[in-house]
């Protein structure tokens, strides 16, 4: 039986997520951006959280850790490399670590780039992954603590997940990402169609997430370093994949 997922907005543009295993009754919170919206989601669903799965140390992902831990006596899991920066952490994980939500297997993927210790959580049986600020819909996270080749390798890992994998990200950045994507991949018809859909969703204040690996592979320039049209547009036909990624990231930083 697949997990049930409740996605909701926190702060100005963060996504909060609850992941519930109906068989065991266990519930995980993916990051804790803000207490009040998380409590509202818990009340709305009737699910009692048993753990927080932290992806990285930035305050807009851990702010409610201690308040939720005190209220629900839950355990907080997070990356070993950032344990000193994550409030209330009880258990650390790294590449290859395995957790369980009831019988649901959670595989930890090290995805540094945005921060040096960032991790993503993959639930293969439910075909879902939580990538926070590594992979966004039509984008990737800004590189605060790592160089472009590090993020490139992290995105390669995520791109290798099955195309049908549903992806939940950390922020509602998709509209701005779409506008940038069109500047580096202007002839991509799938991207143009997706950008139109995104514009309509945001006019109605509707979320653009979740997405899928397959959709990102066809439209997200940060996963399309190999594409001949993008390479030609950038004048980088003979460059290495990591170089193309770095140029796209540089352009996004200045967009």
Curated annotation (Swiss-Prot):
GO terms for molecular function: hydroxyacylglutathione hydrolase activity; metal ion binding. Pathway: Secondary metabolite metabolism; methylglyoxal degradation; (R)-lactate from methylglyoxal: step 2/2. It catalyses: an S-(2-hydroxyacyl)glutathione + H2O = a 2-hydroxy carboxylate + glutathione + H(+). Its cofactor is Zn(2+). Its EC number is 3.1.2.6. Keywords: Hydrolase, Metal-binding, Zinc. Zn(2+) 2 binds at residues 60-61, 133, 171. It holds the Pfam family HAGH_C. Zn(2+) 1 binds at residues 56, 58, 114, 133. InterPro entries: Clx_II_MBL, Glyoxalase_II_hydrolase, HAGH_C, Hydroxyacylglutathione_Hdrlase, Metallo-B-lactamas, RibonucZ/Hydroxyglut_hydro. It comes from the Bacteria. Binds 2 Zn(2+) ions per subunit. GO terms for biological process: methylglyoxal catabolic process to D-lactate via S-lactoyl-glutathione. Thiolesterase that catalyzes the hydrolysis of S-D-lactoyl-glutathione to form glutathione and D-lactic acid. PANTHER family: HYDROXYACYLGLUTATHIONE HYDROLASE, HYDROXYACYLGLUTATHIONE HYDROLASE GLOB. Belongs to the metallo-beta-lactamase superfamily. Glyoxalase II family. Monomer. This is Hydroxyacylglutathione hydrolase. It comes from Mesorhizobium japonicum (strain LMG 29417 / CECT 9101 / MAFF 303099).
């Amino acid at each position: 039986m697949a997990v049930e997922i409740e996605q909701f907005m926190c702060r100005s543009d963060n996504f909060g997520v609850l992941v519930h295993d109906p068989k065991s009754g266990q519930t995980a919170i993916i990051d804790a951006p803000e207490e009040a919206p998380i409590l509202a989601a818990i009340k709305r669903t009737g699910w009692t959280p048993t753990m927080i799965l932290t992806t990285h140390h930035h305050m807009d992902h851990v702010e409610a850790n201690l308040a939720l831990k005190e209220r629900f006596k839950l355990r907080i899991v997070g990356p070993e490399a950032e344990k000193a920066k994550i409030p209330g952490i009880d258990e650390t994980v790294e590449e290859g670590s395995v957790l369980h939500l009831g019988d649901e297997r959670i595989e930890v993927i090290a995805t540094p780039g945005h921060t040096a210790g960032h991790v993503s959580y993959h639930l293969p049986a439910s075909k879902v992954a939580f990538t926070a600020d590594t992979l966004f819909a039509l984008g990737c996270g800004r590189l605060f603590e790592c160089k472009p080749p590090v993020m490139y390798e992290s995105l390669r890992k995520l791109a290798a997940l099955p195309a049908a994998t549903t992806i939940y990200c950390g922020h509602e950045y998709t509209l701005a990402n779409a506008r940038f994507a069109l500047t580096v991949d202007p002839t991509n018809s799938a991207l143009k169609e997706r950008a139109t859909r995104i514009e309509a969703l945001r006019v109605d204040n509707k979320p653009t997430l979740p997405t899928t690996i397959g959709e990102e592979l066809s439209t997200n320039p940060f996963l399309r370093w190999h594409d001949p049209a993008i390479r030609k547009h950038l004048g980088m036909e003979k460059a290495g994949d990591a170089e193309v990624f770095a140029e796209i990231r540089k352009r996004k930083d200045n967009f």
